[in-house]
Amino acid sequence: MHALGHCCTVVTTRGPSHWLLLLDTHLGTLPGFKVSAGRGLPAAEVYFEAGPRVSLSRTDATIVAVYQSILFQLLGPTFPASWTEIGATMPHNEYTFPRFISNPPQFATLAFLPLLSPTSPLDLRALMVTAQLMCDAKRLSDEYTDYSTLSASLHGRMVATPEISWSLYVVLGIDSTQTSLSYFTRANESITYMRYYATAHNIHLRAADLPLVAAVRLDDLKDHQIPAPGSWDDLAPKLRFLPPELCLLLPDEFDLIRVQALQFLPEIAKHICDIQNTICALDKSFPDCGRIGGERYFAITAGLRLDQGRGRGLAGWRTPFGPFGVSHTDVFQRLELLGDAVLGFIVTARLLCLFPDASVGTLVELKMELVRNEALNYLVQTLGLPQLAEFSNNLVAKSKTWADMYEEIVGSIFTGPNGIYGCEEFLAKTLMSPEHSKTVGSACPDAVTKASKRVCMGEAGAHEFRSLVDYACEQGISVFCSSRVSTMFLERLRDIPAEDMLDWYRLGIQFSHRSGLSGPGGVVSVIDIMTHLARGLWLGSPGFYVEQQTDKNESACPPTIPVLYIYHRSVQCPVLYGSLTETPTGPVASKVLALYEKILAYESSGGSKHIAAQTVSRSLAVPIPSGTIPFLIRLLQIALTPHVYQKLELLGDAFLKCSLALHLHALHPTLTEGALTRMRQSAETNSVLGRLTKRFPSVVSEVIIESHPKIQPDSKVYGDTFEAILAAILLACGEEAAGAFVREHVLPQVVADA
């Protein structure tokens, strides 16, 4: 089989670059293809140059692939990271260097070779001769170990040392029986490197592969050497160091699959096998976050922070999350900006649900307490990612750095395939994880134990809920990683009337008796019961657990308790929430509406506000799910009611920041975090939002003036009303409709950064 090629020009934000494009014959001819602007990627068009096709044999194409991989190591990759919509006959193919996948394809469907210009003659013969020379079985100089004295195969290990800029290398010649390395030394110097990290497992290379590996002469360690006792001559211990990323790029034809199978990830700087196990564990713990989300991104983040921007090793790589011309620092800061907005939105929504009677000031105070840098700094260190905390003294100048890392993870998950749902899953299992609760050593009273069991069975009465709350208050619990917030939580929970708490329970809790976490030995204290109940009410995380007090010390099967989401889940779960029709009927639908009105401190008054709400609902150019118009009108009435819409405004403000951050992140992949922040702020000022409010039908302004006879044209009330209307759309119609509303009205108001 032969591989066809075309000369083409790739036009990106960095300007045009010329390539030889190789593709497999079975894909057929291509009329042209377009590079889409994916999340974090710039748009690019590809144009074919006139001229004959280039035809290469499979062997020659493989040589070209090897040659280009070497060039990429020397010059850095400059081709697009993700190609989509590549004609009608070509499937989607994500082609990135370095590869962060466990089993890369044996031969790349697309292979790119940089050219001086698209019109220059391509001397394939010279190219193949050059590549063949690199692949021929040539020996290293006498400075290095003579391969002719080696056995049929070699063992090696991946080794890293911070004294050499955290660059990572394959050390060829480490005996398979050797369990550790003693130290690094530099030739002709008295320096001894004592800090190093090596993989626990050996890498096996065939002798036939060694000439190819040895021929790749990069400017790495030059005359560094390492004592290698065992089967090696102690008088000539010099060995060749090879950056492992190059091994990962070589085609499978050269039998380096064992190296590829190590799944090289940046944080191998401590121990590659431990990191792989961690990634697998994270994947099992957070299956809904998406593989493109926090796990892989955190690996890249950790590795680059370890490198500390020295410009070698890890810092020289381009990640799939960053477009051309954007540094790693800029990529992380952009994701931090996005994650901060997403975190603020989810926390705001959950607090509104958890504390329906709290004032806006109290809610803001709670939110600031939950997302403060010190709390997030602690959370990052409890995620179970190994070895990172050990480097904190060297890497973290401020505690804010770790908090930024958490926000970067949230932002990365948000840009992944699961979006806001992946973020909710991640927050539910990290921000409010079981490690943050304080258990009580004493046994629960029988009354509390029985009440707990009845709660789990769905048969609890109001007095039994109250007994759990009172017991929790007496014992004291630690929630949200803050004793101050814990106290505020208990006060709010204790202030809820028992009968209302029962309504919360019946409305918001669905039971799943076949899943859930367990404490040590399957026994969890009643303090954990209340703590997990709080988490369930707020984040929909795995619920509370019951200690079954029996003579045999057997544990009851604990349920998992997802809860009432305070926004558009009502649209997506009609079975649970009933039919939100013109005249809601049934206990569930009535209770839901009553709960919303209680949370937002609203009592329907009809009149002009009802008419205005109907008018606004008809003027919205957004997708509105069927059956939600009455619900939307009720919420729009709240949005137009003075001194009542504050909580809607709080939610709308949080969603506006989140939505604008996402849109700007996708539309401007090369801008820095500072530029994106300035652009977002230009569109969310009160003056801009006030002007948008005045563009609604005149009845809206009439209602506002009726409520504020002396209102000034530039009053903050207009901007607050817009945010409240946005929140009403969010609650009634969901994120898609609210996002469309932001795109239609707010996004055009963004001022481009100079």
Swiss-Prot record:
Signal peptide: none
SUPFAM superfamilies: PAZ domain, RNase III domain-like
Annotated residues for binding of Mn(2+) 1: 336, 404, 407
Superkingdom as given in the UniProt entry: Eukaryota
GO molecular function, one term: metal ion binding
Keyword Iron: no
InterPro entries xrefs: Dicer_N, PAZ_dom, PAZ_dom_sf, RNase_III_dom, RNase_III_sf
Cofactors: Mg(2+); Mn(2+)
Domain PAZ: 132-251
Binding site for Mn(2+) 2: 649, 720, 723
Keyword tags: Endonuclease, Hydrolase, Magnesium, Manganese, Metal-binding, Nuclease, Nucleotide-binding, Repeat, RNA-binding, RNA-mediated gene silencing
PANTHER family with a match to the protein in the record: DICER-RELATED
Function, as annotated: Involved in cleaving double-stranded RNA in the RNA interference (RNAi) pathway. It produces 21 to 23 bp dsRNAs (siRNAs) which target the selective destruction of homologous RNAs.
Protein name: Endoribonuclease Dicer-like
